[in-house]
Amino acid sequence: ASTADQRQLLMSDLQALGLFPLQAQLHFDCCELDLQRVAAEAKDCDAVLAAGGGKVLDAGKLLAHRLSLPCITVPLSASTCAGWTALSNIYSPQGAFEGDVALDRCPDLLVFDHGLVRQAPPRTLASGVADALAKWYEASVSSGDSSDGLVQQAVQMARVLRDQLLIDSLTALKDPDSEAWVRTAEACALTAGVIGGLGGARCRTVAAHAVHNGLTQLQACHHVLHG
């Protein structure tokens, strides 16, 4: 419901371009019940366009993967880097983490519209900052000594990302019209995803995500964002 206006605008824009979008909404988080229902509805579609938060983007990526369709992601917040990564997390209808699926590729196109993302509640950017900051601590602990060139590049990108967020994030949260907001939002939603793409599981196989996934089993934690 919180993104209804943006979704309606997107539908109108697509129709104005002569396209015939079929709209589908998730009843749960990225859940098998929703995925099976939407897959049946989308069997004659040419592509999957996912617009929303991280779980909507995860669902769109996984749906496109299963249907062998091109995938376009449109993040409506900077709360995670889900719009850029080749990974989807699956949850139960109750919101508990069940597992993740490694996809064969990243989305074919990511559209990061500052105007859309600015409409998201400030707490979503705060969540994105926390999620992106964690990339350095996860990557440096799990793969700081790796001899793999791409992994080392991911680790160093995570360090630069951390420094950028420590400089800009407070100003960004106070002033969404500032250049600091642009740098911070792009760092959270875009750069953090590149780190995940280069480093993969080797840059996140530490306690942080395991603790997060365990906490999703508790109903009392379901109002808390990923970051």
Q: At which residue positions do the language-model features occur?
A:
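ATP/NTP phosphate-donor binding region
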Residues: 1-47
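Alpha-helical structural signal in soluble globular domains
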Residues: 9, 13-17, 62-66, 214
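A short, small-residue-rich loop immediately preceding and capping a beta-strand
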Residues: 42-63, 67-78
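Active-site segments that bind and position negatively charged phosphate/pyrophosphate groups
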Residues: 147-227
